Curated annotation (Swiss-Prot):
It comes from Conus caracteristicus (Characteristic cone). This is Alpha-conotoxin-like Ca1.2. GO terms for cellular component: extracellular region; host cell postsynaptic membrane. GO terms for molecular function: acetylcholine receptor inhibitor activity; ion channel regulator activity; toxin activity. Expressed by the venom duct.
């Protein structure tokens, strides 16, 4: 295998790695955004004291950790 052929194979491997990395990164952005939104809602409810109030806690059970 000549130097030119080895260099071509190297470039193809780099390109394939970049494409796979880029597409998997974009796929995870949606999951990260959803988790970030839920976390920010939980922080907002907790800071306001909502999770300490029974009625508010029942209405926001998903954010306050369930019904107790």
């Amino acid at each position: 295998m000549g130097m030119r052929m080895m260099f071509t194979v190297f470039l193809l491997v780099v390109l394939a790695t970049t494409v796979v990395s880029f597409t998997s990164d974009r796929a995870s952005e949606g999951r990260n955004a959803a988790a970030k939104d839920k976390a920010s809602d939980l922080v907002a409810l907790t800071v306001r004291g909502c999770c300490a109030i029974r009625e508010c806690r029942l209405q926001n059970a998903a954010y306050c950790g369930g019904i107790y």
